[in-house]
Amino acid sequence: MPVPALCLLWALAMVTRPASAAPMGGPELAQHEELTLLFHGTLQLGQALNGVYRTTEGRLTKARNSLGLYGRTIELLGQEVSRGRDAAQELRASLLETQMEEDILQLQAEATAEVLGEVAQAQKVLRDSVQRLEVQLRSAWLGPAYREFEVLKAHADKQSHILWALTGHVQRQRREMVAQQHRLRQIQERLHTAALPA
């Protein structure tokens, strides 16, 4: 109960006292003492209620502050989760791009290997022709066979050079594929790490 109301109650109790200067009798004195005790009891009850109110208000303030901190923590965690999702999405996009590049390199390597096979077959045919001409030249060193031999020999040298260049190209592609696979593994590891719970 608020203190002003208690004061008003005390004033009313004083008004109810007899205005005469004569001493109070037994019943009047008892009634006055009862009113005094009632006032003091009401005052103590009001003070106790006021203390309970202030304590409760303090607890509510602490609870509001705790809820505010909890809400802020939830908000920060939500931001972290959002950033983690964005990072995982970027890693997936990078992984897809790397896989596409690896597929392209694989197709190029297969096409180059096919060309190398054809060149190797052509070179074998050419070597066989050169060997046949060498046999013919043993019997006739001069003449059209010799000129044909020189042409075929030059062609064989050219084919050997092309084969050598293609072999180097295949080796470079293999090195690129190895590097690409290493990069792909790194991205997969990062993606797996990003997906793990904190």
Swiss-Prot record:
It is found in: Secreted. Induction: In response to food intake. Stimulated by insulin. Changing R59W: Lover plasma LDL-cholesterol and HDL-cholesterol levels. One of its GO terms (biological process) is regulation of lipid metabolic process. Hormone that acts as a blood lipid regulator by regulating serum triglyceride levels. May be involved in the metabolic transition between fasting and refeeding: required to direct fatty acids to adipose tissue for storage in the fed state. Predominantly expressed in liver. Also expressed in adipose tissues. GO terms for cellular component: extracellular region. Belongs to the ANGPTL8 family. Interacts with ANGPTL3. The keyword Aminoacyl-tRNA synthetase does not apply. One of its GO terms (molecular function) is hormone activity. Residues 1-21 form the signal peptide. InterPro entries: ANGPTL8. This is Angiopoietin-like protein 8. Proteolytically cleaved at the N-terminus. Its main location: secreted. Keywords: Diabetes mellitus, Hormone, Lipid metabolism, Secreted, Signal. PANTHER family: ANGIOPOIETIN-LIKE PROTEIN 8 (PTHR21463:SF0).
